[in-house]
Amino acid sequence: MSLAAQQSLESHYVMHTFGRSPVEFVEGHGMKLTGDDGREYLDFLAGIGVCSLGHGDPAVLSALEAQTKKLMHVSNYFYIEQRGQVAALLSKLANDDVDGARVLADAIAAGDETTAAALGAPAADEQVWETFFANSGAEANEGSMKLARLYAKRAGNGGNTIVCMRGGFHGRTLETIAATMQDWLQDSFRPLPGGFVACTPN
């Protein structure tokens, strides 16, 4: 479908929540995207509504195919393979234990459950970092806000204000728009949840 036809269709059936650049991507390989007119672009986007894995990477496609043949998705109310391993890997990386993370990643990739389980157990003197898995930046940001307020409440210090940087963007939910501190994004949705204060980055 041409860009013009796609624009016409979306003008009728897709909510106009933000402006779009007049380009329709129809294919991607590696970091190259191809528009409907055949023009190629380099994909440098990361962090806003994107999946930063490249396009058509054989290793990613193979992993996706293998996983979807086994199990597509289940609720997080159940245990699933590799969630604990990935969380252990992230904890090691947060501790700057690159070598330990590499050994753990290799064991996970090789399917060596015994080694991966042993390596994943924290050492007695190891700082353990817990992971909250989220499916979007807004959900991750709201999760961090909830954790900060829960920590302050449990610490008994009465702190419940989140400090936000002016000019930042934290998501499209009501709470993350309140944290975004940009009037042009907030005006249409007032009143907003409270508990945020803005500061200007230096």
Model-identified regions with their sequence ranges:
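Active-site-adjacent loop/helix segments that line or gate small-molecule/cofactor pockets in enzymes
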Residues: 1-32, 199
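Short secondary-structure boundary/capping segments
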Residues: 23, 154, 187-189
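A secondary-structure boundary/capping signal
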Residues: 29, 44-46, 165
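Short, acidic, Ser/Thr-enriched surface-loop or helix-capping motifs
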Residues: 35-36
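Glycine-rich loop-to-alpha-helix module at the N-terminal edge of alpha/beta enzyme cores
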Residues: 40-155
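Conserved PLP-anchoring active-site segment centered on the Schiff-base-forming lysine
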Residues: 151-171
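PLP-dependent aminotransferase-class I/II
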Residues: 165-202
